[in-house]
Structure formats: C-alpha cells, structure tokens
C-alpha cells in the first residue's frame, strides 16, 4: 500500500481542506519525450531510465490515478507538443489530444463534487485552437484549460495565442492557464 492510500488521498497527506487540481501527465509526455513512445490506442509508453521497464499511461489510467489522489479538479490526458512551426505536427497532436479527451471524459463519468477539464491544444495556430475548443465544448467538460503554452514560444506569441482564443471560451465555465506562472506573465494575463 502506498503512502497516498494509507493517508487517504492528497487532502489528508497535505492537511489541506482547499480544492486540489491535478494534471494528467501530458506535460511529462513532452518533457520525457526521449523516454516516451506514443501509441494512439494504448497511450503514452514511458521507459524507465533506471531499469528500462515500461509504464503505460492511457487516458483511462490517468483519470484513475487522479481519482485515487482524490483530486477535486482533474485534467484530461493530452499530448503537449514541443514548440514547432510544423502545423501538421501540431494538428496531429491536437487530434490525438481530442481522442484522449473523449476517452478521459468517458473514464471520468460524472461527479457533481468533482470537475474534469478539457485541455485546449493547437500550438500558436488560432484555427487549430478554436477547432480544439469547439470539440471540447461538444464533449461538455466542466472547465477548460489552455495547454501547450510556456513551452518555448516568446511571451508575445503566448499572449497573442491567449488573445486569439479567450473570447471564444465559455463564459459560464472555469478557465485554467496551464504552465504559466512567472510574475511578469501573471500580471499581464487576463483570461
């Protein structure tokens, strides 16, 4: 039995009564890309740098882990691509993220006391971001996260991407800007 199970989840482990948000593992897919293979149907296959063992992170397993952590706000599994000017790579990643978003939603089910956020991907391309957002709205997530930013683009590129998308996001659902958190970023961002 792991420590998390012995203490009853993150709230008890941290002695925190406030809501807790957990990520899906999508960023680790990118940051550990040299040790990761992507299989559309299986998920992300991580290879241990220590002993070479493989670990699979599917959308369903990501949701299961976040549920075991007793997270209040869970993230759908996405693929966060590295910054590139190749629109086709960004589109393929976005399409995969949308497939995984639906699988994450199905694995989550419904829970009036928890929330599942879909992650808007699409790189620096407004048309891809808006297409992704449209599909995530159709899936009917409890909130929406903007992912794939602060991964190598300039601050101006990040702000332009935010400005291009924010007015299209549902006004009645919460928003979360992932991975952005320098003091100068936070003072200038209004989503």
Language-model regions: role of each:
Residues 4-109:
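Non-catalytic, usually N-terminal nucleic-acid engagement modules in DNA/RNA processing proteins
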């Amino acid at each position: 039995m792991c420590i998390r199970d012995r203490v009853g989840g993150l709230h008890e482990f941290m002695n925190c009564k406030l809501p807790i948000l957990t990520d899906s593992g999508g960023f680790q897919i990118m940051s550990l890309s040299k040790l990761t293979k992507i299989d559309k149907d299986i998920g992300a296959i991580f290879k241990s740098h220590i002993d070479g063992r493989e670990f699979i992170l599917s959308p369903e397993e990501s949701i299961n882990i976040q549920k075991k952590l007793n997270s209040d706000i869970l993230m759908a599994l996405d693929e966060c691509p590295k910054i590139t000017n190749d629109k086709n790579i960004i589109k393929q990643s976005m399409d995969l993220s949308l497939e995984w978003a639906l699988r994450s939603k199905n694995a989550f089910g419904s829970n009036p006391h928890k929330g599942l956020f879909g992650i808007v991907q699409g790189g620096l391309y407004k048309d891809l971001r808006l297409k992704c957002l449209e599909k995530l709205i159709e899936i009917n997530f409890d909130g929406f996260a903007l992912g794939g930013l602060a991964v190598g683009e300039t601050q101006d590129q990040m702000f332009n991407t935010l400005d291009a998308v924010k007015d299209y996001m549902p006004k009645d659902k919460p928003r979360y800007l992932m991975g952005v958190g320098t003091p100068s970023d936070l003072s200038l961002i209004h989503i």
